[in-house]
Amino acid sequence: YYLSTKKIPVVYMQNSGIGNAINPLMSLTDKEVYNIPLLLLIGWRGEPSIKDEPQHIKQGKVTIPLLESMGIKYAIMSQSETELATQLQFAQDYMNTTKESFAFVIRKGTFDNYNFSQKNSADWCLSREAAIQIVASTLNKKDIIVSTTGMISRELFEYRETMCQGHERDFLTVGSMGHASQIALSIALQNRQKRIYCFDGDGSALMHMGSLAIIGTMHPNNYIHVIFNNGAHDSVGGQPTVGLNINFPKIAEGCGYEYVFSVSDKKSLCEILNRIDRKSVV
């Protein structure tokens, strides 16, 4: 955006995304490389002394030190409109003068609640939660599940609790978004005698799509990759993904998955689960 317009772009992220951003911030936009200014709006999960989920605690502690280590000037966004106006003017002047990035770290509760005018309104015949329950109910006692971050892991956990089942065969990837499929792959390669299921989401699959190529190339015959595609990041407000605009089955086929199925209703899902060739990557 900056290269084509010379206008300063705004990049919004949760602080868990800083890790993914470090490389381009240091090797591309930094003043010692191309000196491209960005206005970073960073949601502060896991702020010290503020109760949050376990996966956010460490990231919350190091959010400010990371910005300082990268040499990125920052401010904690004020909840006072007058003070915020001063902060914004300072940030604008700083970026225009130095061509360096500036970050606003945003505490929980800084903004009022907002109702989206448009929401993901797909008319699902089968909810994600119901689909998770159906697949989980077909597994035998030796099968292992690696579930992705967000609602999928939460709903799998709740299903186990409701059914009075243990959690010892489930690895809930509560953080590390996009990496569940590779965790499952490694487990599958080291445990050939067991079937390994990856319960993935469209958002996490999109985040690291190169993982599909690695899985297809490694071709473990005990790996079953299930992508629950609802076209939204449900656990962080329901923001839409492009999951409903692309063809996951074709992508999987192109990456070397031997058997690929797509279903959208309970009957079809049950039929496919009964047909799956357990000896091939799916």
Where are each of the predicted segments found?
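Short hydrophobic alpha-helices that are characteristic scaffold elements of the AMP-binding
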Residues: 3-4
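Thiamine diphosphate
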Residues: 8, 35-41, 48-59, 158-282
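Cofactor- and metal-binding active-site motifs of prokaryotic enzymes
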Residues: 17-34, 51, 56
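Glycine/aspartate-rich loop-and-adjacent alpha/beta segment that forms the canonical ThDP
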Residues: 21-24, 28, 48, 100-141, ...
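Structural signature of the thiamine diphosphate
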Residues: 37, 68-69, 73-119, 249-282
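Glycine-rich beta-alpha junction loops
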Residues: 45-46, 106-112, 149-153, 230-232
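C-terminal binding/interaction regions
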Residues: 49, 63-65, 75
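Active-site diphosphate/adenylate-binding microenvironment
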Residues: 115-177
